[in-house]
Amino acid sequence: SYIYNQFVWNFYWRNVLAANKLLAAFPLETSSNVEKGYVGAAHAFRALMYLDMARMYEYLPTDGTSMPNDAGNDVTNLTVPIVTEKTTEEESYNNPRVTREKMAEFILSDLQAAEENIVYLTESSRALPHLDAVYGLMARYYMWLEDYPNAKTYARKAIDESKLKPMTQEDCLSTSKGFNTLSCWIWGSQLVKENDVVQTGIVNWTSMRLLSDMQHNVLAVRTQ
């Protein structure tokens, strides 16, 4: 089905595009402290997108499959192409999938840049990432690499920095709090009346594309 690929294109790659536009518009060396906060957020957004896509597309050996595949290619440990704010149109024509190792280096560099600059972010809304979210992404990153001691360390940092507590069963099952309250999350999406998903009333799986528009606009507006 095209739906799966459409979701990846509309959500993940559009968020990568938004982050790249912001990073291109605000070079760190000439940015004010306020702008550095958004630079940090852009790095966190991009790290999240690539971490998800790397795990989705990476082929790992299993008992039921083997390489080369039916097309005669060995795609073991290949993730997705890396596109940054510095990637030219010409370079994009020959930009193959990168290995797990190269992707891990790239994601870590984004997370380190996010950790360094996101402390300047003045907006408190959890619709944008903050230091606790960066630590949470670090924990997820190290889980992917099976580095469990570091995953544990950063998971604890995320919890301590967020000052949140795990939800109770009552919170999880409630229709008015828990999963439905942004304040219970380290990082989430916040719908407002102007969003298409509210205007159209399409509150179902299809609305995920509209949610991607919202995430896209959160970053893209900073370049205007």
Where are the model-predicted features located?
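Conserved, well-structured interaction surfaces
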Residues: 1-59, 98, 116-119
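Start-of-helix signal in alpha-solenoid helical-repeat scaffolds, especially tetratricopeptide repeats
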Residues: 10-12, 40, 73, 80, ...
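Structural signature of alpha-solenoid helical repeat junctions
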Residues: 31-38, 45, 78, 103, ...
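Short coil/linker segments at helix-helix boundaries
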Residues: 56-105
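Hydrophobic-face positions in mid-chain alpha helices that act as interaction patches
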Residues: 79-80, 128, 147, 152-224
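Aromatic- and glycine-enriched pocket-lining scaffold segments that form the walls
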Residues: 118-152, 156
